[in-house]
Amino acid sequence: MKKIILFGIAFLVISCNNQNQSKIMEITKNEKLIKQYFEYFNKHDWKKMSEMYTETADFKDPSLGPGIITQTRKQIEDKYAELNNIFPDLHDKVIQVYPSGEKHIIVEFVSTGTAPDNSKFELPICTIFTIENGLITKDFTYFDNFEEGE
């Protein structure tokens, strides 16, 4: 009888561990996806980066205006290509990645670039990505949009 109980407990522990492994694997996939995202960003491969989103994705981004804005892949690609024209050396340095549940990754990073007039910017940013079925469905970005002189 003791062997049966011990076997049952061992089976239960192994079963619970396998469920946790599945969740860990999902988080790892999402972290890899976001790592690839920033690699495409820093290579200025806007097409490949835009293909990491669903056909239309929700954005919350001070540069797009207030509220949630829906963007197509083409709009995403065009937005970053335009930004890259203004700042040819545009670069994001990831500071920290914070997995949050099965569908969210929070990324803290610093965006930098130099304009044609040699003025530089350095902008700390935090983005919450929602990832479903291997694609980004939401990109909620937060940064201080305050400009001097306003």
What does each model-found stretch correspond to?
Residues N85-I86, G113-E122:
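Short, cysteine-centered beta-strand-loop-beta hairpins and adjacent loop/turn segments enriched
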Residues S50-S100:
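A solvent-exposed, acidic/Ser-Thr-rich amphipathic alpha-helical stretch
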Residues C16-E51, E55:
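Short, low-complexity N-terminal intrinsically disordered segments enriched in polar/charged residues
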Residues I4-V13:
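Sec-dependent N-terminal signal peptides
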Residues K103-S111:
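A short hydrophobic beta-strand element
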Residues P124-E150:
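Short beta-strand edge/turn micro-motifs at domain boundaries
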Residues H91-D92, F121-T127:
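Short, surface-exposed coil-to-beta transition loops
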Residues I34-Y37, M49-S50, A57, T72, ...:
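Hydrophobic pocket/interface hotspot
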